[in-house]
């Protein structure tokens, strides 16, 4: 199915602006600290690791690392919802924190399902950070609105990305800089955002960084604020099952 052609996509391109939320796992320096004895050794190790990473284009060097990192690495082995394996990576976020958490919870379940054996404790504890950043482009698309909404089933397919990857390639070829689309994971019908290039950011620093604690088990994923006494936000496995099984990204 060619959604872009069916919806006369070139005629749907509009200026787009907004604020997105992204949730990321804290790894990096915490991981390297476990490999050395002193902070001085860690600093040296971080420098060595930096030289082994893909080089940054000049236009990205002024961006905060949370904004530039997603563009720096190749896609996963299955690509992404709107990106093929051979294409540059996109920056994905959500319009609301709850939607970002629902998306992140799915990938925590994918992580759990990929383990040969679950941990003895029956859970995985991890630290995450949420942040906000504004975007503004002249060439944007809203896939959650007509005429694209008639293809919602394909846009939100739980495991088959072939149609959306074809759409992503078509948008990229048409010069689209950013787009919004319906979330496939959010039970409240949230909206996600994707940026094709760093030029879509209207600021170079993230806003409103918030720390979160995450608990992953075989049955649920929970996020809780690491700063305030807050009720955990729970996402049950049943939200993501298709015919009784957890679909794998493909």
Predicted regions located by residue number:
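Active-site and NAD+-binding cores of ADP-ribose-processing enzymes
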Residues: 1-84, 109-250
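Generic detector of short, well-ordered, non-transmembrane alpha-helical segments enriched
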Residues: 95-96, 175
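Contiguous mid-protein beta-loop-alpha structural module that forms a pocket-lining wall or clamp
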Residues: 99-105
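An acidic- and aromatic-residue-enriched active-site/binding cleft used to recognize and process polar
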Residues: 96-97, 184
């Amino acid at each position: 199915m060619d959604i872009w052609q069916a919806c006369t996509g070139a005629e749907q391109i509009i200026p787009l602006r907004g604020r997105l939320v992204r949730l990321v796992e804290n790894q990096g320096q915490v991981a390297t600290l476990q490999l050395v004895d002193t902070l001085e050794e860690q600093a040296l190790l971080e420098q060595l690791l930096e030289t082994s990473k893909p080089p940054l284009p000049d236009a990205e060097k002024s961006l905060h690392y949370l904004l530039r990192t997603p563009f720096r690495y190749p896609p996963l082995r299955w690509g992404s919802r709107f990106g093929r394996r051979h294409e540059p990576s996109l920056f994905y976020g959500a319009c609301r924190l709850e939607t970002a958490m629902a998306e992140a919870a799915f990938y925590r379940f994918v992580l759990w399902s990929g383990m040969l054996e679950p941990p003895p404790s029956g859970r995985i504890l991890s630290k995450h950070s949420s942040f906000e950043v504004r975007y503004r482009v002249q060439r944007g698309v809203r896939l959650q609105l007509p005429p694209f909404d008639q293809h919602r089933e394909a846009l939100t397919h739980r495991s088959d990305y072939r149609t959306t990857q074809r759409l992503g390639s078509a948008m990229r070829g048409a010069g689209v800089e950013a787009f919004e689309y319906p979330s496939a994971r959010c039970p409240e019908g949230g909206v996600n955002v994707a940026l094709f290039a760093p030029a879509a950011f209207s600021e170079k620093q993230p806003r409103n960084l918030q720390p979160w604690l995450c608990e992953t088990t075989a049955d649920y994923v929970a996020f809780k604020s690491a700063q305030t006494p807050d009720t955990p936000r729970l996402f049950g496995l049943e939200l993501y099952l298709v015919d009784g099984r957890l679909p794998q990204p493909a």
